[in-house]
Amino acid sequence: MTSPQHSNHHRMIMRQVYYFIVLIALAISSCQRTNIPIATATAIPPTVTPRATTESQPIPGGPYLLRAGISIRSVANADSGSIKLALDPQTGDLYILNSTTGLRRMKMDGSYKVEKVANPKDILEDGTLSGMAFGPDGALYVVADRKVKEIYNQAIIRKGIVDLQGIFQWKTLAETEPYPLSNTPFDHMFNGIIVSLDGKKVYVNSGSRTDHGEEENNHQNFKGVRDVALTAKIFQIPTDAENLTMPNDEDALKAQGLIFAWGTRNAYDMAFAPNGDLLAGDNGPDADFPDELNWLREGKHYGFPWKFGDQDNPQQFPDYTSVGDKRLSSDFTAVQIGAYRRDPDFPKSPGGFTLPVANLGPDAVKYRAEDGSEHDAAKEKLPLYTFTPHRSPLGLAFSTSPKMPADFRGDENTFGAFILSWGAAGGNLSDRGQDLLYLKLTKQGDNYETTATQIAREFKNPIDSVLVENRLYVLDFGTGIIWELTFE
C-alpha cells in the first residue's frame, strides 16, 4: 500500500506503503455515520475468475500461483529496499530505484543483466529518493524528500535527460517550501509520480502527515497542526518547468494551478487506464477501514480525513472515544501513540466527496463491522469501497497487449489490470495481502466498479510491478527479487 532515508526512513517506507495510499473518496456530503458497507444500486454480477483455480509453488520459498497457465521465475536481484520499477519507453529497459543504492537498469534483451546507472548523490546531493517515472520522450523524473532543520520536509522533483554519452544529466523541475513533519510513521511525504500521456505534465502524490487527520504537533513544535497545504493531495506540474517553487499555501497553490486533486491519504502508485483515465491505490488509516482504488479527476476531493472508503472517520464526531472502538487493535501504531482520541476541534467536513471504486469481490473484500466482527462483503452481496483494510494496494498495471490471454485482458466494456498488496502490518483480519490481484474494471455511471481475483500470494512485501506484453515483473521489497510472471 503510501518515505525513505532520514533517521526513521527505512521503517517509514514500510509504513508508507502499509499506511497509505492516494485516494480516499465518497460522494456523500452529510456527516451521517456509516460503519459498514452501504447497499447501493450497484449490480453484483456473478463472480468472475479468469480461469480454473489451481495452487502451485513452482519455486521453493517463492510465491504460490493460483491460476492455471501462469509460470514464474526469478530474473534478477535488485537488493532489499528497492522501491520502484519503471520501463524506459525509448530502450525498453527496466529501471530500478533504491533509496540507498540509487538507480540501476535491467537489460530486457533476455540477459536480465543489472547495471548501475546513478548513485543517489548523482541525482540529488541531499535527499531520499522515493519515486520515479519515465515520460514518453525518455525523460526520467525522480521524486525525493529531504529533512530541513530536523522538523521540516522539503520535496524535490528532479528531471533527467540522457546526453550523447548515454549519461543522465539532472536538473530540478520543482521543489516545495519546507513544511512541518509530524515525526511519526505517518509522514508519508512525496513519493508516487506519473507522467501524463502527452508528456506535458507530471502528477505527483503528496501523502498525509497524519494517520487520520489528527493533530500532530511534533513535540509541540507545531501546535494545532494537522495536515497542511502541501500534504494529502495530488499535484500537477508542467514538465517544462525549472526550479518551480511550490508554496505551503493552499490559495497560492490553487492560483498556480498546481493542485489536481484533494483528500488522498497516500496514493503511492498511479497508472493510466487504456482510455486515459488516471487511477491510483490509496492506503487507509491505522484502523480497520478500507484501503482504496480511486479514479483520479481534476478538482475532485477523495474524502481524507473525513471518509475512508464509504465509511466515516469517527474522530470527526464530538462524542467519539477510542475506548471500545472495535476497529482499533493494540498493535496499531496509531493506537499506541494515542492518535485515536476525543477530538472536539476536528475540522468540519466540506462534503462533496468522490467515492472510490466499488469492489465486488470475490477477493480482498473483508471488512470490520462496528461490533468488531469480520465480514465478507461479496458473500453478503455488498460492494466494498475498495479493499480489505491494511492491504496497502500498489503496483497497479493495466493489461493491454494482444499477447496477453483474453481472460486477462479487457474487452469493449471492461479494463483488465493487476494490483499488488504490500500486506498487513497489524490487526487480525484474515486477509493479510502480500499478493497479486487481477481486476476487471467496468465503468458504472460516473465511476468504476471492479471484480478482484487473487492469482498469486505469499510475496515478501511486493512494492511495484511493470507489465511488458504478457509478462508481469514484480519487485519484492523484502527480498529484492524481481519475479517474472508469464501468462499463457
Stretches with model-predicted labels:
Residues G160-V162, I237-T239, L296-E298, E484-E488:
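Short beta-strand-to-coil "C-cap" segments at the C-terminal boundary of structured domains/repeats
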Residues L26, C31-I59:
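Ser/Thr-rich, Proline-interspersed low-complexity disordered segments
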